[in-house]
Amino acid sequence: MLTKNLLLCFAAAKAALAVPHDSVAQRSDALHMLSERSTPSSTGENNGFYYSFWTDGGGDVTYTNGDAGAYTVEWSNVGNFVGGKGWNPGSAQDITYSGTFTPSGNGYLSVYGWTTDPLIEYYIVESYGDYNPGSGGTYKGTVTSDGSVYDIYTATRTNAASIQGTATFTQYWSVRQNKRVGGTVTTSNHFNAWAKLGMNLGTHNYQIVATEGYQSSGSSSITVQ
């Protein structure tokens, strides 16, 4: 993430130097407006919940924390972002949420989290846009939970952004066949099914009900209970 942001800043500075002197001020104002229209990456506590928001800086995305476990996201022509509310650390808990999720293109609504030792990024996908996120991984099996069958996948990310900086790590995916926005996710059912397939989690880091967008537009309004 840091490297990409530095490259973007370098590219902007190079472009500014390439224009006539009388256009520099105008370009500077335009770049300032561009940087201000998207929410910067951040984490923390908000109204009794942990929140995490990360963006690669591409496109226009606005993340807003609301009361208690509520948040909204609006995005347009983004690169990649993921954000939401939940807990730090996470656990094998029942998670109830409600709201709306309307992606145009590639987006996911999921229980999303990380563990360490091993470093694992995991998704329990409740709904998605026009791309099934598991299709790029290795199919492992299924688990039935909360009124639907979920397909289980693994994938490996190499030299990618993680909670420990740039790293190589494994992703675990449960992707719901019958999409929904709202209900209770029994995370222990997924964690146990993964373990039976040799997909072991480590020590829980954060765990949120997340909206993610990738090269897409859309909006989301979610409340975690």
Swiss-Prot record:
Its main location: secreted. It catalyses: Endohydrolysis of (1->4)-beta-D-xylosidic linkages in xylans. Residues 1-18 form the signal peptide. The keyword RNA-binding does not apply. PROSITE patterns: GH11_1, GH11_2, GH11_3. Gene3D superfamilies: 2.60.120.180. The active site is at residues 121, 212. Endo-1,4-beta-xylanase involved in the hydrolysis of xylan, a major structural heterogeneous polysaccharide found in plant biomass representing the second most abundant polysaccharide in the biosphere, after cellulose. Optimum pH is 5.0. Retains about 76 percent of its activity after being incubated at pH 2.0 for 30 minutes at 37 degrees Celsius. Residues 37-225 form the GH11 domain. This is Endo-1,4-beta-xylanase B. Keywords: Carbohydrate metabolism, Glycosidase, Hydrolase, Polysaccharide degradation, Secreted, Signal, Xylan degradation. One of its GO terms (cellular component) is extracellular region. Metal ions, copper, iron and N-bromosuccinimide decrease enzyme activity. Manganese, calcium, L-tryptophan, beta-mercaptoethanol, L-cysteine and dithiodipyridine stimulate the enzyme activity. The lineage of its organism: Eukaryota, Fungi, Dikarya, Ascomycota, Pezizomycotina. The keyword Translocase does not apply. Pathway: Glycan degradation; xylan degradation. One of its GO terms (biological process) is xylan catabolic process. It comes from the Eukaryota. The gene is xlnB. Its EC number is 3.2.1.8.
